[in-house]
Amino acid sequence: MIELKHVTFGYNKKQMVLQDINITIPDGENVGILGESGCGKSTLASLVLGLFKPVKGEIYLSDNAVLPIFQHPLTSFNPDWTIETSLKEALYYYRGLTDNTAQDQLLLQHLSTFELNAQLLTKLPSEVSGGQLQRFNVMRSLLAQPRVLICDEITSNLDVIAEQNVINILKAQTITNLNHFIVISHDLSVLQRLVNRIIVLKDGMIVDDFAIEELFNVDRHPYTKELVQAFSY
């Protein structure tokens, strides 16, 4: 379970980015955080990950095995390491897997799942496309077998086929390894395919919180309706 109680946060004392955030996410629930750029979505993710501490309020996680997948994969990889080295480091660090043969077998299985060529493993991060690197980024996090996954705009660099591939993989992982994941996105179609609950942020505050089946209900917050209408164009 993830629980935020009256969480307030600001990068300086004059302006709060998030104000009085109250969220409870039970095990097994996948949640999308929806809102425009600058509304506090990524800051909220950073707080859950423990990268920042709230100015006020409390954050509780029942499981400490929480990992992020960030929007820009190039900043998530060591530029001097091959893709293979970075992936195997995750297997060693998070799972204690040191046997090279076992590591290779896991990598080959995941390469097939993510529809990536094994020849790319010898490349540096700067030598593969942004879409390929983002798929490797997702792969690395899943190889680490986290219980909670925080996904921050992870499909922004992917074409539509690769995007659906990653979504299918994450949905399958929900059944196997993950307790739940939180998806930060401005793309409503991604959230509709991935989560069963949406929380809407506006100006650092929660203005709506509903099950995905209730997205088009007439009693949705006016801002939620505005986002839905904007996306439909």
Curated annotation (Swiss-Prot):
It comes from Staphylococcus aureus (strain NCTC 8325 / PS 47). It catalyses: Ni(2+)(out) + ATP + H2O = Ni(2+)(in) + ADP + phosphate + H(+). Residues 2-228 form the ABC transporter domain. Induction: Transcription is stable during the exponential phase and increases only in standard conditions in late exponential phase. ATP binds at residues 35-42. SMART domains: AAA. Part of the ABC transporter complex NikABCDE (Opp2) involved in nickel import. Probably responsible for energy coupling to the transport system. Required for full urease activity and plays a significant role in the virulence of S.aureus during urinary tract infection (UTI). Its EC number is 7.2.2.11. It is a peripheral membrane protein. It is found in: Cell membrane. Disulfide bonds: none annotated. Its main location: membrane. This is Nickel import system ATP-binding protein NikE. Disruption phenotype: Deletion of the nikBCDE operon strongly reduces nickel transport and urease activity. Mutant shows decreased virulence in a mouse model of ascending UTI. Insertion mutant shows attenuated growth in several infection models.
